[in-house]
From Swiss-Prot:
E.C. code: 2.7.7.7
Reactions it catalyzes: DNA(n) + a 2'-deoxyribonucleoside 5'-triphosphate = DNA(n+1) + diphosphate
MF (Gene Ontology): 3'-5' exonuclease activity; DNA-directed DNA polymerase activity
Protein name in the entry: Error-prone DNA polymerase
Similarity remark: Belongs to the DNA polymerase type-C family. DnaE2 subfamily.
GO cellular component terms, semicolon-separated: cytoplasm
Amino acid sequence: MDAASGILPDYAELFCRSNFSFLHGASSAEELVERAAKQGYRGIAITDECSLAGAPRMHVAAKAVGLPLVVGAYFGVTPDDAAPGHDPGPGAFGLVLLAQNREGYGNLSELISWRRMNAPKGTYRLTPRMLAAPPRALAHLRGVPDCFAILVPTYPARADVLDAQLAWFDALFGERARLGLVQLQRALDGAHREQVRAAGERRGMHIVALGDVTMHIRSCKPLQDTMTAIRLGMPIAECGHALAPNGEQHLRTRQRIAQLFPADALAQTCRMLDACHFSLDDLRYEYPHEIVPAGHTPTSYLAQETWAGARRRYPDGVPDTVRQRIEFELALIADLKYEPYFLTVYDIVKYARSKDILCQGRGSAANSVVCYCLGVTEVNPQQSTLLFERFLSRERGEPPDIDVDFEHQRREEVIQYLYEKYGHDRAALAAAVSTYRPRGALRETGKALGVDPMLVERVAKEHRWFDGSRDLLARFASVGLDPEVPLIRTWAEIAARLLNFPRHLSQHSGGFVVSRGKLTRLVPVENAAMEGRRVIQWDKDDLEALGLMKVDVLALGMLSALHRAFDMITAWRGPPLPDGRPFRLEHIPQDDEATYDMICRADTVGVFQIESRAQMSMLPRLRPRGYYDLVVQVSIVRPGPIQGGAVHPYLERRRIAAGEAHGEITYPSEALERVLERTLGIPIFQEQVMQIAIVAAGFTPGEADALRRAMAAWKRKGDLGKYHERIVAGMLERGYSREFAEQIFEQIKGFGEYGFPESHAASFAKLAYASSWLKRHEPAIFLAALLNSQPMGFYPPAQLVQDAKRHGVTVLPIDATKSGWEASLEAQPGAAPPDGRPAVRLGLSLVRGLGEEAARRIGAARAAGPFASVDELARRACLERRDLEALAAANAFATLAGNRRDALWQAVAAAPERGLLAAAPIDEAVRPALGAPTEADDVFADYRTIGLTLNRHPVALLRPALDARRLSSAAALRDRRNGRLARACGLVTARQMPGTAKGVLFVTLEDETGCVNVIVRPELLERQRRETLDSQLLAVSGVWQCESDVRHLVAQYLEDLTPLIAGLRTESREFH
């Protein structure tokens, strides 16, 4: 501080790590920026360790408050001869690199990529030799040009070591070299400061003040200590000097900083800040050039392919409205120079189709007629009220987002195609930031605090998937711990603070970034956990914030199932047309009455998108009878319409339209009638909200899209409030009442909870109908396709098989003499191809402990001739003992050896001996008499070995005992009158708590006659938490409710009857 004037010196923090320096930084980018701005800093740097993962978030936060940001990174530099993983000794030092311009940023990004890709995931190593003499291909990185380099000496500094380091440092970095001074009020700060001052003076090197910041405020110190303990894998009490001695690594006041550092060191921070001219806004994405053939520009090639596709889509002539729309879209795409993006996606889709990989674009891309003509999407925009501005507009200021789903079992082929075409140096997956969830946070913090491991596990297991941070103390109390005990309260507080902190980078589900030049100069790239893949350090939100392109190559299980089903139909029934082409999506008859009858009954187990509890409850009320009804059905069971109060008014208007209720469907204006007519005056889709803003409040299409994005982010960022006055004023100006305007705004807020775009729903509705048609008309093929496409969907194989059997499908057991690896079709008597219903033979893939290679050898041996015995099968297929035991336990030898117990005996006898007993004589004639297993034994063994049974349902075995307890079956409850008391019991197959359910848990029970839907209200859930969440076999007493074919049991009391099926390994799935 200037003693004469009392003016605080300017200061910029140039050494600051966020929580993206995993388990080092204890504050988020947003917290750091807010604190720096509040303290009046001139600027701040983001210098996460060998990472730029936190830079986009820091950039957005700093830009919002007008705080200059320097992009950099910190590295721990170890001596050349230091063994990795060992104490590097006094020769180690810290290195802060700060990008001065775009070239320097590219060099920094490439350096990070090089070191990350040459080390195990999550680690890196940097030595002086690497900086001074990188490999020939990276020779341009020598000395990391266009970056400031700050040497941070090991504390406390030693004159001899520091002099040697500075001599090397100065020779390598020259005028960009700086010597960093850190003052954290440690015991040897004075001596350290003097050594740094003297060394800088001897070398003529500028000294710069550094805060070595890892948190925004001092009170984060307990969290930082806990993270240190987690990182080191030991309790805090054992961390010793690894812990920071105090809380000084926060963004201190300028007054405090002025007391700690020389004026020149403070001034140097601002001089360096002013010399750094790079911003992440300077990044410019360059599209690949390979996708344009010789003789074409991107504009001409996109136009050529679009018009060719239009002629295929409209063989009777392209309608004038479509022609005009194509011309408009092509002109806008050319004006924004996005043609290469469309062509990149088009190339990917063309490749997939050439390999007969089912794919379908979805999301906002379905709003585009160009995407439809290119074959990227399958939804004709002419058949709906899709809004192109939801996809692309001038005001949007960022590339469009095209999501393409591929068969989940073949998506890897598409990913490898991208790597092969563009090379690993130009293509990588976007990151997904894995964050701390409640159980993980409780476990990690509990261990760090030294809590007994058994107690840690008890508390963690008590916290379920739907519990939030507010529930932490309640969970401690539920296991008998006093929340007022200081240790328990500290544990809860630190665990809550750690929630949602970045834990590590994983790979996005399919967001691909492809560049014209080296991708590593745009963003750091590191190895993914999966071999053969690389991942950038930014996630999809970071890419969107910076306006950078990604292509979403997503996996969808239902596409795999549909493709398999279509191939089975072709093989079983023959080609659908004389031209011999295989059965495909377009061959499914539209508007099939029997299919819609099934959908209206909510008979949709296994069907895409409409198989969840919430969807099944809505189906009998909405009663879809056509494609657009399915579009609405897919969309309406979402938080947006539910929170926006759209569901009940829409259902009531459907009843009015059908003549089942009195009333009139009215619209506030003709303009809004055009927007809302298809949904009877009720906004269901995101596009409708945007259109309301345009026609009723005077928004431009681009402004409406900004509103849509604000809706998506308002819960997280609170950005929606600024639109309130604009919407209300705009609607008042156009003659709408204030009451109606406020109602519209509340509905818009509801859509902030996640409203479905119509374009997305339109794509999904096609697959929902296709899978429904298959379930109704080809149930055996549908089952086989689903089984062969696992894991996918809402239901595990056991429930899929039980449902198929209730629909008359014959399911045959696993048989080593007949089964392949996958489920297959077999003719039944009188039902040979192409007529009649086939039976489904379960595949060997269900057998736990059996590998695909062993199954392949069985198939190859079987092709050479039938097996006469287990011993012959074992010998010809070269099976190991573990393979034979797995098959015997799964009853796959029934045709060769009788029951399980006999089969297991024969399997052991047939197994090749190894080691000392290989030559021992064995008298196989002596064989004990083995009793046949009971039906219950077989059922339990089925679940244990293949996860399902073809015998009687486990609950059927208990029916006499359940009858004695007056517990009804699902079938008996169907005719129960509304409002009557009822009792039921079944295996728990699903637990679901949607975010809009206000704490209500939906439980599905399955017995031998069907399923019972149970509603557990929050107060009962809290009172009987263990019974609700831990039971495999659950008895429920409550009130039976049935209305409009919607039936459920509202629970009043729960009883865990799992001991009745002790040892049965069933599976239930838990969902938000």
